[in-house]
Amino acid sequence: MSTRPSVMVVDDEKELANLYGLFLERSGFNSVSFTDPLSALDHYSQNHDKYSVVIMDWKMPNLDGIQFAKKIREYNTTVKILLITAYSTDKSFKEEVYREARISDVIEKPFKFKDVGPRITELCVSKVQ
């Protein structure tokens, strides 16, 4: 049995989902990547106790990252959710949306992958909010 934290990645851009997964594996995490949020949600509903962190994009078809986060919370209220976004809008609006969806952390694009690993590690070891 692995003691490495498991991370689920959801991004509708296949190349990015694969890149995140590869980076996570090289950084010491187990990862599973999805490009369809509905498939990811179905998987998560059956495996919600296996993941320490869920990383997702905000802009996705069928179910955006905020809607996805709210659905995830129906299965697990303590999993850490990291939202990756290039979505630009009023800061107070974003903060309210993040709070409502119980987003644990946000990384805004563009970002450097070397900065993501420590943020995920911090989420994995931080106490439940």
Residue ranges and their predicted role:
Residues 18-26:
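Charged docking surfaces used in two-component/phosphorelay signaling
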Residues 33-53:
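Acidic, metal-coordinating helix/loop segments flanking the phosphotransfer/catalytic sites
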Residues 42, 66-77:
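Short amphipathic alpha-helix used as the core "switch/output" element in two-component signaling
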Residues 57:
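Active-site residues of response regulator receiver
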Residues 60:
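Receiver (REC) domain active-site loop signature in two-component systems and cognate sites
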Residues 67, 88-105, 118:
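Alpha4 helix (beta4-alpha4-beta5 surface) of REC/receiver domains from two-component response regulators
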Residues 84-86:
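Hydrophobic/aromatic residues positioned on beta-strands within the core alpha/beta folds
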Residues 111-120, 124:
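C-terminal output helix
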